Amino acid sequence: IEILDLEQFGKALFIDNEIQVAESDEHLYSSTFVNSGLNLNSNKEKAAIIGGGDGGVARECISQNFGFIDWYELDPEVVDVCDKHLSKIGEKATEKNSVKCVWGDAFESIKSVKDNTYDQIFVDLNDDQFCIDLAAKNMSSLERILKPKGVITAQVLSLIHISEPTRRYR
């Protein structure tokens, strides 16, 4: 886990040498991500966030006045580092009364969640193939905990694969 200051994008979170989020444009991603689900179903009683360690999706759910937010995050260190160095993104979402953090493997944790619990589920995992396959493998579990007419919004990899970076900043 690294926070690097990039000239064009400001501070950015890197995990395993891959950029995850940058201060300069994060709000566009998180706002669009949350609002795209709300455009399909405006119910905001209860949301689940799978991943999203930078806190941007949690911040947007809070700003949209969700009643309750269960945030399933594998690594509390990612959240802590982002709270410390990218505090404008998450705005200390973990400290809000409406947010309950569940640390560990999200897909193991949701096995104990009752059916039809969430109005919205936001799957905000890394872009790597492992996370994409993991989310796809567990889609039926996500559907089980989703209320009727609920919406799953998922971050998916671009259709365009870029094999080599043009420039690496360290």
Indicate residue ranges for each PLM-predicted region:
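N-terminal auxiliary segments of SAM/dcSAM-dependent transferases
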Residues: 1-8
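Short, solvent-exposed loop/turn motifs
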Residues: 2, 19-20
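Short polybasic amphipathic segments
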Residues: 10-16
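The AdoMet/dcAdoMet-binding core of the Class I SAM-like
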Residues: 21-159
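Single conserved hydrophobic/aromatic residue that forms the stacking wall/gate
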Residues: 160-170
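A structure-centric signal for secondary-structure junctions around beta-strands
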Residues: 9-10, 44
